[in-house]
Amino acid sequence: MKTRILISLALVGMLACSCSDFGDLNDNPNDPAAVSPKLILPNICENAFRRGTGGMYAYKMVVQTDGHNTDQFYEWNRGDFSFYNNELLQVVKLKEEADRVGSTAYNGLYHFFRAYYFYNLTLQFGDIPYSEALQGEQKALFTPKYDTQEMVFSGVLDELALANEELAKAAAKGEQIQGDIIYGGAASMWQKLANSFRLKVLLTLSNKQTVGKHQVQSEFRQVASLPLISDNSENGQLQYIDQEGNRYPQFNAQWSGFYMDKTFVDRMTACKDPRLFLFALPTNEASNAGKAVSDFTAYAGGNPTVPYGENKNLVGAGQISQINARYRIHPTGEPTMLLGYAELQQILAEAVVRGWIAGDAKRHYEEGLKASFAWYHTYAREYAKYVTPQDAEKYLQHDAVKWDEALSAEQKIERIIFQKYCVSFFQGNWDPFFEHLRTGYPKFAHLNNTPIPYRWMYPDTESKYNTENVKEAVTRQFGENNDKITSKPWWIK
């Protein structure tokens, strides 16, 4: 396990005032604003690689039984721009310090993390501040214009290309990345992650032929020939340690109303997917009846479309499965993943099916599935016995899972997306939701009169303090005064 030093920028600022006691914090003790990049990077990694639970309600893995959850019923309204005020400001600081110390590697990471955050922001909202963003301190620019979503995506792809170039240079000259809690300082591994993430971004844009100057399909082919994540040992993942502030996010979580979704349980049961045993617990009713963990009939979920009280009744009757306790009883949990080998293989499989690259879609599909089982076998502790290589081979023979060349391209993509979906349990943030918007898969249960949203409305603070730019962006995209969660952004038109 890599030693982790997680120091917030605020703490660094306080420590910098005491250079006589903490002389190694600043390369220049006469400049209190100078902070070694190795002290900034851990916090950036921690924030980017952690995964939350909010999206799991929206993409139908869990239900709430002790209250009404707006994500579960697609009733959210406004998002926030906290990435601008927190994470991206840290990334800007990393760039400043990278330039100060002349580090190629940190510059590469700057471009990667900028791309990562702006990718997520534009998926959430549509048009966002990009070219003029984060310039308040340098240029006193506090009301940045909103760039079109196409321009933002084009910029994200440019940044990832720069990340590849800078990290390749750093690797070639043997530059070690100090403060790297993901890859232990290896620039070549970050290069692989950046390139793999670039493929993910390009596939997100599968409904588009061009994005600014970028030709989506030809660029995908070009990037697919670059260094990529090659096995589970190269996953872009954050491993936790049993230390205050560095433990697994769900450790000791209070889950009084956190239960499995019926649609997810039914899907996994239908194809006899043993990963269900890692995700959920048998119902109390099944346990009392003596059913084994490996008995698929021991699992049940709640209906995500009914009032929470109906699912609460299932809790009282012992007829609904809880989330597996392994997620909250182990302080180190399992690593949380920004992007891993299993997902990358499914990205490549879909690209082959779409005709973007040459290759064997079946091989990529099966390799991705086996990689998922192998990963869980490594980290699922007492549940590892249910996801052996033999279990993966058996699962691959199920009629609803196995690769069949007789299937249509659309049917093949549906199977690929389902495998990406399965590896998203406590790992996906909002990715499976955006995959659904892009492909229609997996299909989500929802009330007939409640359309699935496409985005979040802009923050109130933007409407108040950046009024004209917000109005212009809304009108340009959706029509005047049409900032709605059901307004469709450019990327899926």
What are the functions of these language-model segments?
Residues 373-493:
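C-terminal functional modules
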Residues 3-9, 37, 187, 344, ...:
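Generic alpha-helix initiation/capping and coil-helix boundary signal
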Residues 20-23, 325, 391-398:
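Short acidic (Asp/Glu) and glycine-rich catalytic loops that position anionic groups and cofactors
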Residues 61-113, 119-380, 406-413, 419:
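Structured, solvent-exposed acidic/aromatic patches
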Residues 1-30:
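Bacterial Sec-dependent N-terminal signal peptides
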Residues 19-70, 75-77, 82-85, 89, ...:
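Membrane-proximal, proline-rich intrinsically disordered regions
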